[in-house]
């Protein structure tokens, strides 16, 4: 295999442009519509911590990341806004997520029950979003009567607070 020499690549992010875009998007929405800024994969390679620090004082309601490690990185950099973890979180990391005030994605009744038990043990109510599988066959509840019943069961768990569904 030959060694390849490649030119360095970089992207310059103009924060004023982000602010301009955000303000224009906000104008199109109803006043009480919430905005979640997705910062997964280091804000798609543009610096999640830097972007989060900039947006924290703007008219944004949530941040979202793919993995728990990304959420923890934001918390370790003093990001206080709500952070939704969109992806899988191992059972052994659920308590750590709760302790760091990370909103979790629920994609099965089994996971919800485990999280409810951990929430009860720690005394920390878990904020959650319910994930619906929209056809990608990754994670989420299928469009079925059984899933509806499971989501109703989740809504009756005492230590979980359903903030949203996607």
Model-derived regions: residue spans:
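Alpha-helical packing segments of well-folded alpha/beta enzyme cores
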Residues: 18-21, 25
